[in-house]
Amino acid sequence: MNPLQPIQHSITNSQMSGGQQLEAEGSQAHNSYSHPDRISLSQLSQSAHLALDHLSTQPNTDHQRVASLVRNAVQDGKFQLQSSNDTQVTYKTSVCPPANADTMGAAHLINNELTVQARLNDQLEYDIVSAHLYGPSEAISIDASSPPSANDLASSGLSERTHLGMNRVLLRYAVPPRETEDQCVMVIDKMPPPKHGKMSFFRTTNDLSKLPLGMETGGLSDLKLAGCERISSVEQVKSIRAALGGGPLTVLDLREESHAIVNGLPITLRGPMDWANAGLSQVDGAARESAMITELKRTKSLTLVDANYVKGKKSNPQTTELKNLNVRSEREVVTEAGATYRRVAITDHNRPSPEATDELVDIMRHCLQANESLVVHCNGGRGRTTTAMIMVDMLKNARNHSAETLITRMAKLSYDYNMTDLGSISALKRPFLEDRLKFLQAFHDYARNNPSGLSLNWTQWRAKIALE
């Protein structure tokens, strides 16, 4: 990917030169859905999981084998996108025999090709339509049943409540439509850049003066936790460390979108919803950003657009031309400041995926157990940042305080970022933010039942309660 091509294209595009605002319409986004290059378990619908479970229990050993191969390939991230047509998509991988092929009836599973056909449903999850195993000596095809209705789920004993245990919530993590190259431009996130180590929406559990009198604060001051907007300078990192009392500091970057620092300015390759990298794995997203930075370092000049124009908040693009580029990654800036840099990508306006949640828990628990300072940040310092700060509070204090108490106090500390008020949220964002709130309530249950000494991670615990 050449990051400069969409920059120039978008700046000279007739829509932009005409001064029109870029808008993200839900219907347009669905019609131009960009399916992920690889599909994960978290992207499968409940119906897909039930279909695989059903096939695994059938007397037909071929069906059992294919269901097992499909589940393992999805879990290992081996399926690769082959073709798509609107909501229909095909993924393919090659399969090899297991260590004990006889136990699987897979003596001829060398150089076999496994494909699945899936359909994107209204919840932006994938239902499995069919699966096919092709090899030199056999070909097996199975059709998955259509998604069961609510009545079917209830009659099968797999209703939402019973499937995850009493009072447990069925979560529906969904990946939003990835923005196309034509939608994405290189923007300046903040102009003028912050000075003297300052940053917007900075808050720390070392300073609770923003909280109203009488609010429950038990355990907050023990977290050594901070949150803020994007980081773009060594001075900012040093300022954060000082505010947290000095000592070791981990900077946890929650941004999925490709970003860098150019001539001291924070820049991002993004579209209207900031979904340029939606659906990419952590590895693929990092590789895309690395390629962008490499290309920028070869560039002599760069024309950038004000981020608020791309978001649809301004009618004037307010372009800025930079020359003699000094390009740095956030990792380089954080490392120069003497801090540890960690990255767990979360899609903007969304909650962490199950896989990302496991990574976050590992990092957060390490900092809590080692009594090390942790600062989390996204782009604006609001949604993803507040979500992560609530998760840290829950890991430490879920046994002593309710989910409502912990969500409310961290939202209040985060400049009154009310995560429970969805009344003014756009229709495109609403399902993701509703699911984020359900996730936090479920995460409180996890943190209460899995204090730091226990070995179950988030996905293991969710699998465990699904069987209860």
Swiss-Prot record:
What SMART domains does UniProt report for this protein, alphabetically? PTPlike_phytase (SM01301)
Q: Which reaction does it catalyse?
A: O-phospho-L-tyrosyl-[protein] + H2O = L-tyrosyl-[protein] + phosphate
Q: Where in the cell is it found?
A: Secreted
Q: Does the keyword Secreted apply?
A: yes
Residue positions of the active site: C378 (phosphocysteine intermediate)
Pfam families attached here? PTPlike_phytase
Explain the regulation of its activity: Inhibited by sodium orthovanadate.
Q: What does this protein do?
A: Effector showing tyrosine-phosphatase activity required for host defense suppression. Functions inside plant cells causing suppression of HR (hypersensitive response), PR1 gene expression and oxidative burst probably by interfering with a MAPK (mitogen-activated protein kinase) pathway. MAPK cascades are known to activate defense-related transcription factors. Inhibits plant pattern-recognition receptors (PRRs) activation.
* Protein's UniProt name: Effector protein hopD2
Q: What is the lineage of its organism?
A: Bacteria, Pseudomonadati, Pseudomonadota, Gammaproteobacteria, Pseudomonadales
